[in-house]
């Protein structure tokens, strides 16, 4: 199989700029001036103390004393921020290289992302795009994050990868219908470790397990894709829970 063609910095910036127009969860800054800001941290995040501290902040915001609930939501939020811009850019034919990715978090705002050295590859079709995205997001980012989680909390692998799948599919709820994005998401959901975590159907994605958000006091809602909800009946809109 031939190696994917490299994409120039200008192509990567253009694809990420287009992705960012879908909303804040799709934004990755490529501004070189951000290099002067010492609050950026490299990704993947492997510091258990840092992640444990963020989990505690999430727990405080959610009003829960259950560390694993907050850790689950933290993982899903980070997965969403990683999938959303990369999949949107890949649907335009360019997959960014995330080896220079940095992150910054402030309460009440989406995780901010900055790519220090914009580079990447051109994707010639859905299968090639899925190969590249899987390598960048799953292998390069989510697997190291998943490996760090057990150092400060207890969450099953199936739950974490269900969260990752939910975050991936949830990106399709933002912006206009896009056949290329949908095909790419469907292809990624068919590959390990996401394969078997849920089903992408005409009403959207339904996962086979639960992110634990329903345990947030005083009685958190079930998410719209939760495996604990019944499927919608014919002609009925999809259930609405936490986005």
Task: Describe every region a protein language model picked out.
Residues 1-67:
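Generic N-terminal leader/targeting and pre-domain segments
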Residues 4-5, 9-20, 90, 142, ...:
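Generic hydrophobic, helix-prone segments enriched in Leu/Val/Ile
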Residues 39-202:
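Hydrophobic, aromatic-lined core segments that form the binding pocket/scaffold
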Residues 173-243:
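Cys/His-clustered metal-coordination modules, chiefly Zn-binding fingers
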């Amino acid at each position: 199989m031939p190696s994917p063609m490299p994409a120039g910095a200008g192509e990567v910036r253009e694809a990420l700029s287009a992705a960012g127009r879908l909303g804040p969860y799709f934004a990755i800054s490529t501004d070189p001036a951000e290099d002067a800001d010492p609050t950026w941290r490299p990704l993947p995040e492997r510091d258990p103390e840092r992640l444990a501290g963020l989990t505690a902040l999430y727990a405080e915001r959610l009003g829960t004393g259950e560390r694993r609930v907050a850790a689950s939501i933290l993982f899903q939020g980070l997965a969403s921020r990683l999938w959303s811009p990369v999949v949107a850019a890949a649907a335009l034919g360019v997959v960014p290289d995330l080896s220079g990715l940095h992150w910054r978090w402030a309460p009440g705002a989406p995780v901010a992302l900055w790519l220090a050295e914009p580079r990447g590859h051109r994707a010639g079709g859905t299968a090639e795009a899925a190969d590249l995205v899987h390598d960048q997001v799953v292998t390069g980012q989510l697997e190291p994050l998943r490996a760090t989680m057990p150092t400060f909390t207890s969450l099953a692998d199936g739950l974490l990868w269900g969260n990752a799948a939910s975050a991936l599919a949830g990106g399709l709820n933002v912006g206009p219908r896009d056949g290329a994005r949908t095909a790419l998401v469907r292809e990624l959901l068919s590959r390990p470790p996401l394969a078997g975590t849920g089903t992408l159907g005409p009403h959207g994605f339904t996962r086979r397990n639960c992110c634990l958000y329903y345990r947030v006091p005083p009685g958190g809602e079930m998410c719209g894709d939760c495996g604990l909800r019944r499927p919608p009946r014919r002609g009925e809109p999809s259930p609405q829970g936490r986005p």
